[in-house]
């Protein structure tokens, strides 16, 4: 299955992935009308920090679409579910208890703009893009959408242990 992968060496922290994500999920056709002067609510977040040598490091974080997702298991209403390997949310079933937010080990689920339900990356499966908008909008190809095979449990946890993306 294709997944979003990040190369933190190439990330410029320009936040264009966030803007492209917010626009793709806005339901509007004009980016300026959709985003100008508004707080954006992207499903991908750029994290900025320093590495062990005190050098600046930045990378984008979004849902890892885990094979055995804790968020889906913890969802009390069944609003989170797997569709062809993609963790999707059903806003009609979500009651805003945020149990999934607390259970996601990557911090990739967040309250929606409305604040009463959650939002998360669904790999742009519910909008008009052929690939995730964050990938298409990254000027440096720091974000890619590739099939690298099924990650082992150790690879799934590598993000947490090493403090970086694959």
Question: Model-predicted segments: where are they?
Answer:
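Non-ligating segments of multi-cofactor redox enzymes
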Residues: 1-166
């Amino acid at each position: 299955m294709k997944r979003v992968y990040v190369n933190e060496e190439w990330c410029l922290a320009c936040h264009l992935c966030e803007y492209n994500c917010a626009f793709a999920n806005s339901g509007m056709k004009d980016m300026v009308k959709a985003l100008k002067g508004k707080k954006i609510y992207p499903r991908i977040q750029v994290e900025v920090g320093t590495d062990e040598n005190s050098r600046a490091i930045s990378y984008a974080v979004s849902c890892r679409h885990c094979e055995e997702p804790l968020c889906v298991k913890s969802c009390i209403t069944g609003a989170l579910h797997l569709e062809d390997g993609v963790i999707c949310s059903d806003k009609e079933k979500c009651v805003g208890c945020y149990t999934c937010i607390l259970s996601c080990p990557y911090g990739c689920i967040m309250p929606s703009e409305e604040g009463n339900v959650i939002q998360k990356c669904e790999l742009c499966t519910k909008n008009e893009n052929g690939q995730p908008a964050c990938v298409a909008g990254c000027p440096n190809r720091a974000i890619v959408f590739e099939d690298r095979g099924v990650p082992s449990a150790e690879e799934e946890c590598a993000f947490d242990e090493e403090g970086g993306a694959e």
